């Protein structure tokens, strides 16, 4: 069993699968019905919710066993949630935001695969059946590749006409924070060989925390 995920409600048997399914459909239905009452985006919310449920079912039943595809499905799930949130808030999404969300989600998904593989190599406990289809070297290359794409995409985003016209033409000054954050994260997992769970790292690493806070402050000052 996964050293962390085994404590989740369903995995730890605190919530039965039947109860979880009932709660899922009740909450999903209540949310979509609520949007039907307050605005006309209810049908789109239903489509997003239905698509997300089907995607998760396909992932749970068989796609999570397929290397590479499993991580891409996780990233697609984030895009569906992003689209649903935009519909609910009546916000027009920028194609830059969609692209960066997908690539960042893909990066984090592969980072977790690397963490699972490292745990398997150290303890012999396999928490994900398809993890044997990966190697540390391969995942290091993938993470380096995706981190480069994230950096380039963010730079292009800050320089794009639609962003400079609506926000600030000086948004590019936030680029060093993004680069520093990426390089620090890669240093943690490749040099320090630490746990590469993004949540754990962000909660514990002061350098990364300062980088995120610095980016947020400068970004907010520039657009407001």
Predicted regions: what is each one?
Residues 1-12, 110-137, 191-198:
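Cytosolic, membrane-interface loops and tails of multi-pass inner-membrane proteins
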Residues 1-49, 95-106, 141-151, 206-224:
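Multi-pass membrane catalytic core of lipid/isoprenoid biosynthesis enzymes
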Residues 21-60, 64, 151-179, 183:
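Transmembrane helix-loop-helix
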Residues 54-67, 112-120, 184-194:
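C-terminal ends of transmembrane helices
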Residues 67-77, 202-208:
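Cytoplasmic-side transmembrane-helix entry/capping segments in multi-pass membrane proteins
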Residues 91-92, 127-146, 205:
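Membrane-water interface at loop-to-transmembrane-helix junctions
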Residues 91-110, 166-179:
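Alpha-helical transmembrane segments
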Residues 186-213:
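Interfacial loop-to-transmembrane junctions
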């Amino acid at each position: 069993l996964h050293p962390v995920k085994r404590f989740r409600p369903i995995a730890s048997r605190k919530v039965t699968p039947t109860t979880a399914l009932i709660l899922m459909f009740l909450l999903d239905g209540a949310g979509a019905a609520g949007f039907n009452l307050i605005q006309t985006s209810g049908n789109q919310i239903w489509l997003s919710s239905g698509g997300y449920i089907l995607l998760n079912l396909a992932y749970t039943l068989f796609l999570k066993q397929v290397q590479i595809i499993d991580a891409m499905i996780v990233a697609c799930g984030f895009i569906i949630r992003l689209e649903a949130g935009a519909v609910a808030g009546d916000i027009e999404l920028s194609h830059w935001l969609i692209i960066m969300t997908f690539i960042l989600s893909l990066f984090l998904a592969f980072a977790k695969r690397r963490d699972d593989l490292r745990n398997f190599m150290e303890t012999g406990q396999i928490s994900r059946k398809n993890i044997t289809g990966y190697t540390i070297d391969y995942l290091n290359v993938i993470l380096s590749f995706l981190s480069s794409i994230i950096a380039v995409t963010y730079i292009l985003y800050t320089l794009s006409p639609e962003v400079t016209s609506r926000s600030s033409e000086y948004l590019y000054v936030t680029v060093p924070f993004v680069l520093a954050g990426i390089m620090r994260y890669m240093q943690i997992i490749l040099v320090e060989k630490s746990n590469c769970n993004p949540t754990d790292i962000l909660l514990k690493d002061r350098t990364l925390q300062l980088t995120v806070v610095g980016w947020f402050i400068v970004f907010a000052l520039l657009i407001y």
